[in-house]
Amino acid sequence: MKRTYQPSKIKRKRTHGFRARMATVGGCKVLARRRSKGRLQLTV
């Protein structure tokens, strides 16, 4: 049985990256929350 986490930089960026977040309403809300909280790193 293989492990569930198979790291891939491309997949990581495409699903959790900044542009992926900006593409949806929910993603924009995520970024807004993280900005208001003062996170230094908004996305991956």
UniProtKB/Swiss-Prot annotation:
Keyword Ribosomal protein: yes
Domain of life, per lineage: Bacteria
Ribosomal protein recorded as keyword: yes
GO CC terms in record: ribonucleoprotein complex; ribosome
GO BP terms: translation
Name of the protein described by the UniProt record: Large ribosomal subunit protein bL34
Keywords for the protein's UniProt record, in alphabetical order: Ribonucleoprotein, Ribosomal protein
Gene: rpmH
Family from the record: Belongs to the bacterial ribosomal protein bL34 family.
Gene Ontology MF terms: structural constituent of ribosome
Pfam families: Ribosomal_L34
Native organism: Onion yellows phytoplasma (strain OY-M)
